[in-house]
Curated annotation (Swiss-Prot):
Keyword terms of this UniProt record: ATP-binding, Ligase, Nucleotide-binding, Purine biosynthesis
Pathway annotation from the record: Purine metabolism; IMP biosynthesis via de novo pathway; 5-amino-1-(5-phospho-D-ribosyl)imidazole-4-carboxamide from 5-amino-1-(5-phospho-D-ribosyl)imidazole-4-carboxylate: step 1/2
The protein's name in its UniProt record: Phosphoribosylaminoimidazole-succinocarboxamide synthase
CDD domains: SAICAR_synt_PurC (cd01415)
Organism: Synechococcus sp. (strain JA-3-3Ab)
HAMAP family: SAICAR_synth (MF_00137)
One example of a Gene Ontology biological process annotation: cobalamin biosynthetic process
NCBIfam families referenced in this protein's UniProt entry, alphabetically: purC
Origin: domain of life: Bacteria
Catalytic activity entry: 5-amino-1-(5-phospho-D-ribosyl)imidazole-4-carboxylate + L-aspartate + ATP = (2S)-2-[5-amino-1-(5-phospho-beta-D-ribosyl)imidazole-4-carboxamido]succinate + ADP + phosphate + 2 H(+)
Similarity remark: Belongs to the SAICAR synthetase family.
Amino acid sequence: MPFSPQELLYEGKAKRIYRTADPRVYLCQYKDDATAFNAQKRGSIAGKGEVNCTVSSHVFAYLAQQGIPNHFLAQTGPTEMQVRALHILPLEVVVRNRTAGSLCQRLGLEQGLPIEPPLVEFYYKNDALGDPLVTPDHIRLLHLATPEQVEKLGSLALAVNTHLGNFWRRCRLELVDFKLEFGLDEEGQIWLADEISPDTCRLWDLQGTEPRVLDKDLFRFDLGDPAAGYQEVLQRVLQATDPNLPSPAARERGRG
């Protein structure tokens, strides 16, 4: 059953979240807007909303099959999906498989070095503070999550990393790093939320002699045509997955 938007709950840099007639379901609408460096750089990428919505739908469906609880219910339009209503934790969880981006800048590391085991980092979602890196002790001090929740977030992030790495390899891409967000349901259970797309994953095509960027770094660092890069990721996802996504009834399941 489709759910029409009833009330705008939140508008962020890349998405709008609406209430629906069912209090358990939100409608998530993806935008073409693009930002980088904590919104210091702004623009748009043609077709980004549709790419990110469709890619996220496929990835969330795949992760659900692997036993990762997530908020996705169904894609209801090119740029819209139904999601489980959650209270989003004010944390970003970043998993790094290779050195890249801010990690290299912060620690003076060469880009592209493998990280084994993968590195898990937590960032406080606060635009005014520039989304700072925080430790579990900082999280406890700020009452952002309980120690038990932090431990669960870390273990879930590593599990997602394993399955997500397999998914992107099927698309002939390497998962360099990525960020996740999580939310709590009314019973306090943790669910993977937000999106998983070229906006949130650093993806390198390693088929050539040099890694080729196919993610938001195309926009962030003016490395090429972002719209073309995003469309290529979408086509690879469609080629690598079953296009028939599960229905909301099939997706609605408990944590067990």
